[in-house]
Amino acid sequence: MNNHSPTIGTRLYAQLVSLALWQKTIWVLAALFLLQAHTAQAASDRGLLLEAQKDGQTVYLLGSIHLADKSFYPLREEIERAYKSSDALVVEADILAMESNAALQMQVMQESVYPPGEQLKDNVSPEVYGQLLEWLNQRQIPEASFSRLRPAIAMITLSLIEMQARGLDPKAGIDRHFLSQAHRNNTQILELESVLGQIQMLNSLDNPELYLQQTLEQLSDMDSFVPRITSAWKSGDQEKIYDLVIREGLDEHPEYGPLYELLFYKRNQDMAKKIQDLSGQHNTLFVVVGAGHLVGEKSITELLEQDGFTVKQI
């Protein structure tokens, strides 16, 4: 088993909910890998659920895995009860609303690809593009499917395909589970970010070619990452989730510090501030964000505690 930490693309996909929208854009590709869904019951799995309270207001914080499988369900009764007792569902981005918004889908597509006449191979080294071609050949995916993708989007897309090949599915994601309920029952849905904003943030990364190359070189690490992150989430183990999503990557690649600052710590500050503001307008909120945002130093959880919330895992 490879002892390296999971690829940066894997970590990004696990934490950026908007990238589940690519299931529509590349569904033909994803269909190449039929998922083997597990049937084990999950009602006794703990999951990562925290309760934050301040001045009589309650905020439930559920750490999401944006790709999951049937073995995650049914969720623990306490999780479903917390959702049903809340006034509103708070998510990073409402991907279900986006799926019915053709104009937004077009904006996302325009942000994700190069303009006509410009291609991915023109913007990365021949070495990196050769690595991508080798992977495409192995997966029997046409080069044209990736030829105009921007580097960061290509990195996330191939990570999605590899994670799906290992049995995880965006349609089974924890956030999507609650969004489906909320849309069905007309529950108020509030967004901390936006789909388009997350895509634009990815495209603003410095040196995305480096992250694409690192992802291509360490794809085999997903073989160990998928069962490890699944186990960590089901047991509600905050330390293991932190190790997998953040600490191991920074220990192995300290040069990625600015990347983590942008994708985790800056976003944590922005999301924590918005949660604080929303909590003043509702008695009870049910917040679903990527699990990596709730664990460790400079997490949403820590920032809420600094603002006077009392937080406990339940």
Spans of model-derived segments:
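Structured, acidic catalytic/metal-binding patches in enzyme active sites
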Residues: 49-259, 263
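Boundary at the C-terminal end of the N-terminal hydrophobic targeting segment
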Residues: 40-44
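Alpha-helix C-cap/termination motif
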Residues: 22, 82-85, 278-281
